[in-house]
A protein has these predicted regions:
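Compositionally biased, intrinsically disordered low-complexity segments enriched in polar/Pro/Gly
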Residues: 4, 8-16, 201-212
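Short acidic, glycine/tyrosine-flanked loop/strand segments centered on an H-E-D-like triad
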Residues: 150-162
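Surface-exposed amphipathic alpha-helical segments
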Residues: 62, 160-212
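Conserved polar/disulfide-associated segments of primarily extracytoplasmic proteins
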Residues: 3-4, 22, 26-51, 57-143, ...
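Hydrophobic/aromatic beta-strand elements that line small-molecule binding cavities or substrate pockets
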Residues: 144-149
């Protein structure tokens, strides 16, 4: 089912538990199509940049940028191309319960409170999405946005498409393909629900000194 990454492992467990004397037909498990939990990641040849909790394909013709908070922790990654950006963030979530429905409702409420066109829900390749607008860099105009959410085991991945990639299927396609190839490495550290899962810079890369 789109938007949920546990299907393959759960269904496989059910099949393995079927007694051998039962002869009823058994359906094949659904195949996870990505984004992937690290346990279900495919053995493919995609080159990925390793940001710790996120491993992102880098052959889509876009730049991968990182965003940091006030204490210089990497909290999000942005795929930037000529037709817009896609910001990726991974957050802690319950083990057996998705939070995208709740998060989506809260984002919609926030957008409605900004006196802009009412955001709308649409079905997309990753499940139910939220479409709306946010202020542009000048503060005088708006930018179309598209929020995508994927629930995984103890993690939630949010992708924010901004610019033409939010409304143009052709412009969005390479970004969607990259999103399908993302691997989430949640780790075992206990974190409050919705807390950003810390990312890290690739080996050998350092942030510039903010005082320089």
């Amino acid at each position: 089912m789109p938007g949920r990454r546990r299907q393959k492992r759960t269904e496989a467990s059910k099949i393995d538990a079927t007694p051998p004397w039962e002869t009823r037909a058994r359906a094949e498990p659904d195949v996870t199509t990505g984004p992937y939990d690290e346990r279900d990641a495919p053995d493919d040849e995609l080159e990925r940049i390793d940001l710790g909790a996120l491993r992102i394909p880098i052959d889509g013709g876009f730049d991968v940028q990182v965003e940091v908070n006030e204490v210089q922790q990497v909290i999000a990654a942005t795929l930037a191309g000529p037709h817009g950006t896609v910001q990726l963030g991974v957050f802690a979530a319950p083990r057996n319960e998705g939070i995208w429905n709740e998060v989506r409702a809260e984002i919609a409420e926030s957008l409605r409170g900004q006196r802009r066109p009412v955001p709308s829900e649409k079905e997309g390749p990753f499940g139910t999405e939220l479409h709306g607008t946010i202020p542009d860099d000048t503060g005088r105009g708006t930018v179309p946005v598209r929020f995508v959410g994927v629930d995984g085991p103890r993690w939630f991945l949010r992708a924010l498409f901004a610019g033409p990639v939010a409304t143009d299927d052709t412009a969005a396609e390479p970004f969607e393909q990259a999103l399908r190839g993302v691997v989430v490495v949640r780790g075992t550290e206990p974190l409050p629900v919705r807390e950003p899962v810390p990312l890290q810079l690739p080996t050998g890369v350092e942030l510039p000194n903010p005082g320089s």
